[in-house]
């Protein structure tokens, strides 16, 4: 029931995805060969959200892995859980996208997309009642951004009523891997605004800060960063996979978090933050979890929620705890920080509780917030984009693949519109809306 089909694309997406499957396999007690070695029936009860049970009793992830070069795929295949994936579900090219969005979206990626869609269709047909898709990718490179958004738009055409959730790694402000990141990211956001239902925004710099400041790791590796991301990813869907007192699924999440369809870019956080291999030495309390979860330093993207206001937020608690205490703490947060929540959406924080905590913790929580301060990320990318686009720098790489400058202009203005929409709702008050409605009524009367 309620299956989720997982798709990972590009180097970043495949590395995050591989980590995510390690976490989910561990939670469900599935070993690297796909055999169940767990101890609790709860692990198997809804294992089919993410796994297909093969005839020989092995569990195979509902995962599609794609890339335009074989390198990362090979390292996934030789990694700890590499043997668990279905071999046919590795789809890769040989040429690479060379950090070029146009190659991923129009030329190299477009040649490979049909074979990816075939695998997606095959996996979707194996589902009893497909709930939606989750896509892991980065927006700075060529494959994850260009081909990732191409795949999302194709899936959107074919499965219009299924949820589309993305975990998108944005280019970070100070850490840049490639000079054309602002181009790739802007072109991708242009697509995500239209075709995705929910985007969890991540970025490496915020993750570095968490590793460095909170976890005291002196030289964080991508493995440490991906460990944080995978904890959050597992938290988002734990309600689907384990029984809970208050359940949530991808659609409930969307209904509660998205007041306006274009504003579906969320900040995510996780508490308690732990580094790989370290164990918590004392159990946290619900108030401590709540406090850590709302902390700005905990957000996995480089935008400060204190610079904006929350339109909506959702908290998913895991572990044995009293729902009453959870509700009290959530109301407490809203009362104490009421200026950070828009007053024209009352009760805008949803909470859900799942009984099974993550491995090695007694309780944990995942935070998803729809905050207007996320515009800081878009604004930053947009400024970098404009600086280069004004001089038409590096543009020949894109036009050479058949793109038109017009597409860049459109993507730029779509991004700027998004920023101003966030700003508009950040400044809106409950009273202004009343005036606005009067204007509308006036217009309707004229129209009649």
UniProtKB/Swiss-Prot annotation:
SMART domains: Tubulin (SM00864), Tubulin_C (SM00865). Residues 429-448 have a biased composition (Acidic residues). InterPro entries: Beta-tubulin_BS, Beta_tubulin, Tub_FtsZ_C, Tubulin, Tubulin/FtsZ-like_C, Tubulin/FtsZ_2-layer-sand-dom, Tubulin/FtsZ_GTPase_sf, Tubulin_C. Keywords: Cytoplasm, Cytoskeleton, GTP-binding, Magnesium, Metal-binding, Microtubule, Nucleotide-binding. GO terms for biological process: microtubule-based process. Residues 421-448 are annotated as: Disordered. This is Tubulin beta-2 chain. Tubulin is the major constituent of microtubules, a cylinder consisting of laterally associated linear protofilaments composed of alpha- and beta-tubulin heterodimers. Microtubules grow by the addition of GTP-tubulin dimers to the microtubule end, where a stabilizing cap forms. Below the cap, tubulin dimers are in GDP-bound state, owing to GTPase activity of alpha-tubulin. GTP binds at residues 11, 69, 138, 142-144, 204, 226. Dimer of alpha and beta chains. A typical microtubule is a hollow water-filled tube with an outer diameter of 25 nm and an inner diameter of 15 nM. Alpha-beta heterodimers associate head-to-tail to form protofilaments running lengthwise along the microtubule wall with the beta-tubulin subunit facing the microtubule plus end conferring a structural polarity. Microtubules usually have 13 protofilaments but different protofilament numbers can be found in some organisms and specialized cells. Belongs to the tubulin family. GO terms for molecular function: GTP binding; GTPase activity; metal ion binding; structural constituent of cytoskeleton. It comes from Eleusine indica (Goosegrass). Mg(2+) binds at residue 69. It is found in: Cytoplasm, Cytoskeleton. Its cofactor is Mg(2+). GO terms for cellular component: cytoplasm; microtubule. PANTHER family: TUBULIN (PTHR11588).
